[in-house]
Amino acid sequence: MAPAFLLLLLLWPQGCVSGPSADSVYTKVRLLEGETLSVQCSYKGYKNRVEGKVWCKIRKKKCEPGFARVWVKGPRYLLQDDAQAKVVNITMVALKLQDSGRYWCMRNTSGILYPLMGFQLDVSPAPQTERNIPFTHLDNILKSGTVTTGQAPTSGPDAPFTTGVMVFTPGLITLPRLLASTRPASKTGYSFTATSTTSQGPRRTMGSQTVTASPSNARDSSAGPESISTKSGDLSTRSPTTGLCLTSRSLLNRLPSMPSIRHQDVYSTVLGVVLTLLVLMLIMVYGFWKKRHMASYSMCSDPSTRDPPGRPEPYVEVYLI
């Protein structure tokens, strides 16, 4: 009865008890979303006999061993009892904000729970890093400007060798010589992320790089190669860039109207005029033909124009002697 009364005092609201705060009996643990909780409960001061161990969460002033964690595949938590060291190891993986709260590690003796150790778990949201932000906005960023990329030159035995893999969304790739008649005057700022591997001597580092250029530093693509500064750890590299460009629809909209479109308009106009003249010529030919045909018909039908009836030829008889 005494242990049950002790547990009731521990779970009682702070305003109803005098003395030290109820929070002082909990060990505070602060973790981020996605991390793993790993705590230990010791029972060295108790008799060495086989007892069950329970990990429960406080809900409505009650300790519930069957609290739910529906987002976890597999067991909700892992409890390992080391009887020789008299230590209970509790592990909870894939923490979420819903896991925040108060937990108790208890002994189960003949169906009665005895508290061993309490924990106050605070789970905070994981901060958004610069690594995943460009991937969600990369498509919108690349649609509004021209991106030039290049590789840093290497020289000397101690010069760093940098390789990069850049992620671009599908778009229109245009070489500068295809747009010789069009020269963009300005470029919109852009940002992209490159996963790079840098090695210098025996050291080898991997990291994520974010490169950003502002519109004020942009120049004409035909003025010469540009340079982009990248930084990974304590290594800074300044590299020239090549002329392969990703252009947007706004650049193509500035292009002058193509000659083929003008030729199509002229061809349509000429075709209409020719067809109209052809119809007029057919009407005129039909009129002349009809006029001649009606004139010849009237001459044939007039009785005055017919030949007079011929007289009968004289009858001549010839006798042979």
UniProtKB/Swiss-Prot annotation:
Induction profile: Induced in CD4 T-cells by concanavalin-A.
Region described as Disordered: spans on this chain: 189-241
Cytoplasmic topology ranges: 290-321
Glycosylated position list: N89
Principal localisation: membrane
GO biological process: T cell activation
Entry membrane topology: Single-pass type I membrane protein
Compositionally biased region (Polar residues): 189-220, 227-241
Cellular compartment(s): Cell membrane
Summary of the tissues where the protein is detected: Detected in cultured B-cells, T-cell leukemia and monocyte leukemia. Expressed constitutively on CD8 T-cells and induced on CD4 T-cells after activation.
A molecular function (GO) term: signaling receptor activity
Protein's recorded name: Trem-like transcript 2 protein
Organism lineage: Eukaryota, Metazoa, Chordata, Craniata, Vertebrata
